[in-house]
Every structure is written in structure tokens, then in C-alpha cells.
């Protein structure tokens, strides 16, 4: 509603990708010690509440407000045989463009980057608009960009991204 600024639909109460992601990754971590979740000071963006971070233990790394370091860490871990998954708000992805292109993609490191809130609705103030991630990364060689349309596609893409060893996703 333009006059009130409130959305007309009710989006509360359903499943959210953050919770789905954390539950998925915790299960993968139980099955495979090489799976590592990485965040840059926003663990709840992909569902890692305090108790879920404790469940993950050493397989969860928060680098603080250091998106560049998170991508460099993911690249290094992937090169060493781990299966890193970095969860980041779309709007913060711009902070690590050099690391995405030079550390991750030039080396073709098979890390997984999960971008959240990539829309006008996701984070809707003037400094946190998150819809420029696709045009920003579209020209980076070796990077595979996937965009699921439903939960089932999301899980299929996650399975493929985490297990494949050929490209950053």
C-alpha cells in the first residue's frame, strides 16, 4: 500500500530460506566433516541462530565484518579439499568483488556462495538495496550462478553446488 508503506500480503509464518539452509547444512555437517559454513557477522542470514552455531561447532566460522576475508577463506578451504558455504546478504556482496573474481574464480575454487535478500523487499533502505548481485557477478569467469524458484530446486542446487569440484557457485 503506497499510502501506508505496508505490504498488502501476509508473508509471515511460512518456511524461510535461512532456516531451510541452516537445517540442510547442519545435516550435511553431520555426514561430512569437510562442510564448513562461513559468515561475515550475519549468521542468521542463513539461519544460524546461537544454538545452531553451537551444534555446528568448529564447522561454523564467523569472520566478523570482513566479507573480503570470508571469500578468501572459502577459496582457501575449497582449494584444500573442504566444502565451504558462505552465506551473505546481497547488498554486502559488493564489498568482496575483488576476492570473488581474483581469489575465488581465477583459481576456480569450488566454494559455494549463498546470496540472501536479493530483492527490493529483502533489505529496503537506501544503503541496503540488494538487487545488483546478478549484474555484478555475471561477467566473472568460472562463476556458476544459480537462481532457484522453489524449495525443491534450492535443495537440488545446494546438493550439486556443495558436492561438485569444478567451479565456484
Predicted regions and their residues:
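Thiamine diphosphate
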Residues: 1-169
Amino acid at each position: 500500500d503506497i499510502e501506508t508503506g505496508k505490504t498488502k500480503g501476509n508473508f509471515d509464518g511460512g518456511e524461510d530460506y535461512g532456516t531451510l539452509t541452516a537445517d540442510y547444512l547442519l545435516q550435511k555437517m553431520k555426514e561430512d566433516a569437510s562442510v564448513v559454513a562461513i559468515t561475515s557477522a550475519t549468521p542468521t542470514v542463513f539461519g544460524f541462530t546461537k544454538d545452531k552455531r553451537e551444534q555446528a561447532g568448529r564447522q561454523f566460522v564467523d569472520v566478523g565484518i570482513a566479507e573480503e576475508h570470508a571469500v578468501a577463506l572459502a577459496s582457501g578451504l575449497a582449494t584444500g579439499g573442504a566444502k565451504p558455504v558462505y552465506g551473505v546478504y546481497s547488498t554486502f556482496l559488493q564489498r568482496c568483488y575483488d576476492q570473488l573474481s581474483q581469489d575465488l574464480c581465477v583459481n576456480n575454487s569450488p566454494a559455494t556462495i549463498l546470496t540472501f535478500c536479493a530483492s527490493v523487499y529483502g533489505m529496503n533502505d537506501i544503503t541496503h538495496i540488494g538487487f545488483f548481485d546478478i549484474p555484478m557477478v555475471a561477467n566473472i569467469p568460472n562463476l556458476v550462478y544459480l537462481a532457484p524458484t522453489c524449495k525443491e530446486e534450492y535443495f537440488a542446487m545446494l546438493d550439486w553446488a556443495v558436492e561438485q569440484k569444478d567451479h565456484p557457485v
